[in-house]
Amino acid sequence: MKNSSQIQIIRLQDNLSSIRKIAGWTAEDLGEKIGVTKQTISNLENKKSPMNLTQYIAIRSVLDYEIENNKENTVLPQVITILLDKADEFDEKDYTNLKEAISAVSISAAGGVAGATLASVFTGVLAPIGMLGAVATPIGAIVGETSYWIAKIMKKKDEKQGRQ
């Protein structure tokens, strides 16, 4: 059985390509931000290499920074919340539908669509699959939660080391 840190790492790796594109980054951009090559990012996205905890923390940190400092990209925090932070709140079918919808939005983002237009694409893709209502609560819960993921990891590490 996988622990919660492993599940979070797998979720990020499974969705890294879509998240990166919605952030507006190339593989090279993300690699530069975390100190690895674009080939390393490609290998993570294509699952040629497993993502480790250090890579997870580095990527989540730059994503948090982007969310805090790029208020024009309103889709990124929603996608992070849906695919990573609140994924357990969806049944498997809904989560799969959301992943597919977000993947479609990421294609628009990779093509240069950004800001309010990307937000419209995001809403437009969710509406036909009946997921707008399903994501309303998780999206509303974004405020103040952009770094709670690291608290969960550190708490687990502290518990393993006998610290409270």
Residue ranges of each PLM-predicted region?
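DNA major-groove recognition helix of helix-turn-helix/homeodomain DNA-binding modules
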Residues: L53-N73
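The alpha-helix within a helix-turn-helix
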Residues: R20, G31, R60
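A short, Lys/Arg-rich alpha-helix, primarily the initiator
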Residues: M1-K21
